[in-house]
């Protein structure tokens, strides 16, 4: 639900915000600040408009220990993964909104993260482009072997992209429902199994609209 802290939770997972209590661990490592192992992709691509596609994709590597040869190899692979090879030397201002989001995705992938965090990055795109990117991101994650945590208000997107859906509600937010999404790939919106899970998830989402956090028990 809106305002329940989904994006705040994602920022904590990215090390951008510190939790008021507890800590976040990735394979035993505490996440306390941004790092190449966990990368966040935002709603807007936030590209450098004066740079080419390749330059934008490789900008994060310029602050690290990577050699020129390794940087070029990583950039080339990331651009290939998002299918932008023909536009590698184009200025990003010349690209469509969907292509710019692919550049932002490649910029995240070039770091070879273990965890990719997505904050509704496809919400402003047209339906066709959004559907294509949803499938591509899931496919790339499976091929490269990294995990994804993404925030969405789109139930179809949750079923198409996810292995588990977590519904939050209330303010401050609480996890009120969880649902495993055990479906084979590729997933199509018209598949009966996809539609069945979508219906279950929609029911949970509607129940969350009426969620009220239980009052703490008090002693007489």
Residue ranges and their predicted role:
Residues 51-58:
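Short coil-to-helix segment of the ABC ATPase nucleotide-binding domain corresponding to the Q-loop/switch region
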Residues 22-34:
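Conserved ABC transporter NBD signature motif
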Residues 58, 62, 69-87, 139:
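Conserved ABC ATPase "signature" region
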Residues 91-95, 99:
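Conserved ABC ATPase signature
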Residues 105:
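Hydrophobic anchor residue at the start of the ABC signature
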Residues 112:
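Conserved catalytic motifs of ABC-family nucleotide-binding domains
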Residues 14:
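Helix-to-loop junction immediately C-terminal to a conserved catalytic motif
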